[in-house]
Amino acid sequence: MLEEAGEVLESVLKASCLPLSFLLFVPAVLLLLGPPPAAEAAHESTVYRMQQYELGGQPYGTRSAVLNTEARTVEADVLSRRCVMMRLVDFSYEQYQKALRQSAGAVVIILPRSISSVPQDVVKQFMEIEPEMLAMETIVPVYFAVEDDELLSIYEQTRAASASQGSASAAEVLLHTATANGFQMVTSGAQSKAIHDWLIPSVEGRLTGLGGEDLPTVVIVAHYDSFGVAPWLSHGADSNGSGVSVLLELARLFSRLYTYRRTHAGYNLLFFASGGGKFNYQGTKRWLEDNLDHTDSSLLQDNVAFVLCLDTLGRGNSLHLHVSKPPKEGTLQHAFLRELEMVVASQFPEVKFSMVHKKINLAEDILAWEHERFAIRRLPAFTISHLESHRDSLRNSIMDRRSQVDTKALTQEYQDHCGGFDEGHLQPNREGSTCRSADLHGSDADPGGAARISDGLAEQSAQAAQLIDKDSTFLSTLEYYMGRYLKDVKQHHVKADKRDPEFVFYDQLKQVMNAYRVKPAIFDLLLAVCIAAYLGVAYVAVQNFGLLYRMIQRLSLKTKQQ
């Protein structure tokens, strides 16, 4: 029997019998069509999830973190239960809504390696879209990834496959669907969970004035946390890294001036770097409650001259003083306003200065500016910013990077504030103890110090409130700077109430996404049909081996006769 089988095989090869040759080579063809080894098919990328939080009982952002779907681009006709990949340069809010309307399984937005290389019109458009993305709560997981060569290659292959399906015929689409390679996107993390015991830290420090016990107090405040559509990408170099930089440089300068009797003014200076500024100024709110409601001895309870809030000072040729109530003539706030206006006009004539009056709208869920927290507690306060409106998209964008901050503008803001604190505001408490503007601009002043501090803080990781706890590197750096220049430096912490929390943060904000090269599900069905057909033909051939043998003999004889 084996001899006959060998003779049959030899005859098949000599006669080039197509049906049996096909049967013999089908397994090899199927192996070649199969997916490559798993080790060569996987690619890892770090992805950053969109914001997920609750503020005042209102949820924002995405509610899901699990990603395990096949990749497509917006060019595909069907996006349902697919991971829709988009590049920033091609991104639009209409495309984003299209993906959500079609019940996409996930959305991954690919960002360029360097934001500075992106055209400004694209940056501006995306900054305007960010608030709309957060306002529209969705169950679809939304991630951001920084491009690399492998990820771009995956995107281009997926885009080509998606585009070809839209322009091909039905038969071509079916064939392409059955044979094309795809990419399965899978994240490594679990579903997001609420963090109920998160602490928002703030840092306080002070300089004591020269004189009696009832000295007036000037409070200088800046919130340090950043905000954007993705917490891990929110660096906040301008909003509000620039404000914190100016606060620290003012602390350094006044610490030197308060060292000498001649320049030691009769004012207490209280510096406060607040946390949770982007979440309705939670750090400032709790700090005021602790100092005004829960203690009998506090600088905020005694004689507050005014509160100066620093917010977004690192760009542009404009400077705006935001107030809830215009200061009255004869008050220290009015004198500060006039002196600041004079300094800007005389030393920086190219800078546009104005006062912006906006009443506090208690019906809004989120306060516009930080000084409104103080104004609600009847403390005279105002905010200085280069932004004319609190609705400016720059305040809440992942596009706010160090490369976007103008070092010259930051230095000007610092010098403006130094000029504002002249002898009209830091009056001598006794003869010979006057702090004059000449001293503020003297040898101890360092106009470039604010820019250097900004560079130092920018080297830290993202400064979103969800990422900064009491042991974070950024907070340690901030506390170190304040400890060098100020006295009684200490932290304050805010923890949400368990029964009725004002804010709730969620985890799983940073994950690893694996891209696996896969065949579509229909390929398994097609493969099963081919294997079944192959086995069926083989079975019939074996059952009718005698007939097959005689047929091959006749073919062989004809070949020899020819």
From Swiss-Prot:
Q: Can you tell which superkingdom this protein's organism belongs to?
A: Eukaryota
Which InterPro entries does the UniProt record give?
Answer: Nicalin, Peptidase_M28
KW Coiled coil (keyword) present: no
Q: How does the protein's chain sit in the membrane according to the entry?
A: Single-pass type I membrane protein
- Please list every transmembrane segment annotated in the UniProt record, as residue ranges: 522-542
Q: Which residues lie on this side of the membrane: Cytoplasmic?
A: 543-562
User: What's the stated role of this polypeptide?
Assistant: Component of the multi-pass translocon (MPT) complex that mediates insertion of multi-pass membrane proteins into the lipid bilayer of membranes. The MPT complex takes over after the SEC61 complex: following membrane insertion of the first few transmembrane segments of proteins by the SEC61 complex, the MPT complex occludes the lateral gate of the SEC61 complex to promote insertion of subsequent transmembrane regions. May antagonize Nodal signaling and subsequent organization of axial structures during mesodermal patterning, via its interaction with NOMO.
On assembly, the entry states: Component of the multi-pass translocon (MPT) complex.
Which protein family is named in the record? Belongs to the nicastrin family.
Name of the protein in its database record:
BOS complex subunit NCLN
Its source organism is Gallus gallus (Chicken)
* Originating gene: NCLN
